[in-house]
C-alpha cells in the first residue's frame, strides 16, 4: 500500500547509480515536488569477481558519489545489497548463454529481473508510488487505449529504449523517466550548475561485471574452467587453423583470429559441442529472417496479425525496415534487406515511429 507524506507530496524512489544521469533525475523529481529517497543497488563486489583493479558500477566510488549527491539534495539515501540475486539471475545466465554459443545481453536481463522488479517491490513496501531512473527514454499513456507506451528518448545518441523493451504495463505505470525529454549536454549542464561531484563523470561503457571486456577470462575465473583450444574450419569443413576456445569468439568477428588465408574472413558460426569455429567471407554473415521468443508487447496487448515495423538487433544499430509475423513461441521478423550477423541471445526490439512496439530474444536466423 502506498502512502503520501503529510504535505501530500507524491513519494518517489530514485535509483542512484552514482552517475550524473540518475543524480540529475533525482534533482528534477525534487524540483517537480516529489518526496524523494535515493537508493543504490549493490549488484557486484569487484573482489569476488576478480575485478578489483577495475572501476565498475556499484563500486565504492559510485556509492560515495551517489551518497554525496543525496546529501547535497537533502534526501534520504540507502544502499541495498542484491549481490546474491545478481549472481544467480544475471551472471550465471550470462555464462550459460555464452557456453551454449549465444551472445547474451545482461543489461536487458538486469533491467528485467533485477532493477525494476526489486526497486518497485521495495518502493511499494515503503509506501512510495514511483520508481525513477536516469534512462533516456519516455513513458506516456495512450489516451485512446489507456496503455502505457515506451518511447525513445529525444536525444537519439543516448536513447535507451532498446534495453527497456521488457517492461510491463504494471511497471510502466509506476516508472518515471525525467531525462527522456533532455539531451545529455543539458543533463551535464544541470549537474555543473548544482556542483554535483559527478557532473563530468564518464558514462559506463562495458558490461558492469566485465569492465575489461575479456568475457572468456572472466568466465574462466568465475567457473574455474579452462576453455580449450580447437579448430578453425572453412565453409567446406576443412581445418584452417587453431583457435583459443570457441567461447572466445563472437559472430561477425574479424580481429584477433590470427588467420592468414589470403582474404579477410569472419566468424560465421560456432559448434560448442565440437569446439569448432567456422570462418568465411563477410557475405556469409547476412540473414533476412529472425525468430524470437520471450516476446514482450508494450504498445499492443499481443501480436495477432503482420505489422510493418522498424527493428534493431543490436543496441546502437540504426533501425531497419521489416515485417513482423506472429509465431507459436514468439514472432518471426522478415527484414526488407539482409542484416549483418543477427545473433542468437541478443534482443530484437520493434518500433513504430518513436514508440516501442515490443521485442524478444533472438533464437535463430535464416537467409
Language-model segment annotations:
Residues 20, 132-367:
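AMP-forming adenylation/ATP pyrophosphatase catalytic core
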Amino acid at each position: 500500500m502506498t502512502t503520501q507524506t503529510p504535505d501530500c507530496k507524491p513519494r518517489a524512489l530514485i535509483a542512484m547509480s552514482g552517475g550524473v544521469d540518475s543524480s540529475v533525475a533525482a534533482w528534477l523529481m525534487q524540483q517537480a515536488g516529489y518526496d524523494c529517497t535515493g537508493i543504490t543497488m549493490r549488484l557486484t563486489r569487484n573482489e569476488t569477481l576478480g575485478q578489483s583493479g577495475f572501476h565498475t558500477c556499484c563500486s565504492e566510488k559510485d556509492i560515495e558519489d551517489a551518497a554525496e549527491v543525496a546529501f547535497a539534495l537533502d534526501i534520504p539515501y540507502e544502499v541495498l545489497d542484491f549481490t546474491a540475486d545478481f549472481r544467480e539471475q544475471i551472471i550465471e545466465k550470462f555464462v550459460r548463454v555464452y557456453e551454449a554459443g549465444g551472445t547474451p545481453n545482461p543489461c536487458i536481463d538486469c533491467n528485467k529481473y533485477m532493477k525494476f522488479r526489486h526497486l518497485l517491490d521495495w518502493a511499494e513496501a515503503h509506501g512510495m508510488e514511483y520508481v525513477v531512473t536516469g534512462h533516456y527514454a519516455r513513458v506516456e499513456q495512450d489516451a485512446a487505449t489507456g496503455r502505457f507506451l515506451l518511447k525513445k528518448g529525444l536525444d537519439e545518441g543516448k536513447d535507451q529504449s532498446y534495453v527497456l523493451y521488457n517492461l510491463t504495463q504494471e511497471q510502466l505505470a509506476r516508472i518515471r523517466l525525467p531525462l527522456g525529454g533532455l539531451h545529455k549536454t543539458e543533463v551535464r549542464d544541470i549537474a555543473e550548475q548544482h556542483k554535483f561531484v559527478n557532473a563530468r563523470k564518464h558514462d559506463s561503457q562495458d558490461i558492469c561485471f566485465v569492465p575489461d571486456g575479456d568475457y572468456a577470462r572472466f568466465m574462466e575465473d568465475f567457473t574455474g574452467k579452462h576453455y580449450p583450444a580447437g579448430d578453425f574450419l572453412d565453409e567446406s569443413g576443412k581445418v584452417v587453423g587453431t583457435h583459443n576456445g570457441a567461447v572466445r569468439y563472437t559472430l561477425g568477428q574479424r580481429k584477433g583470429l590470427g588467420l592468414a588465408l589470403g582474404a579477410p574472413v569472419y566468424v560465421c558460426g560456432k559448434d560448442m559441442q565440437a569446439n569448432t569455429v567456422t570462418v568465411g567471407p563477410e557475405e556469409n554473415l547476412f540473414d533476412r529472417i529472425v525468430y524470437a521468443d520471450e516476446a514482450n508487447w508494450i504498445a499492443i496487448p499481443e501480436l495477432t496479425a503482420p505489422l510493418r515495423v522498424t527493428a534493431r538487433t543490436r543496441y546502437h544499430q540504426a533501425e531497419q525496415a521489416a515485417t513482423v509475423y506472429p509465431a507459436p513461441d514468439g514472432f518471426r521478423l522478415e527484414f526488407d534487406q539482409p542484416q549483418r550477423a543477427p545473433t542468437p541471445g541478443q534482443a530484437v526490439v520493434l518500433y513504430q515511429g518513436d514508440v516501442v512496439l515490443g521485442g524478444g530474444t533472438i533464437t535463430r536466423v535464416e537467409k
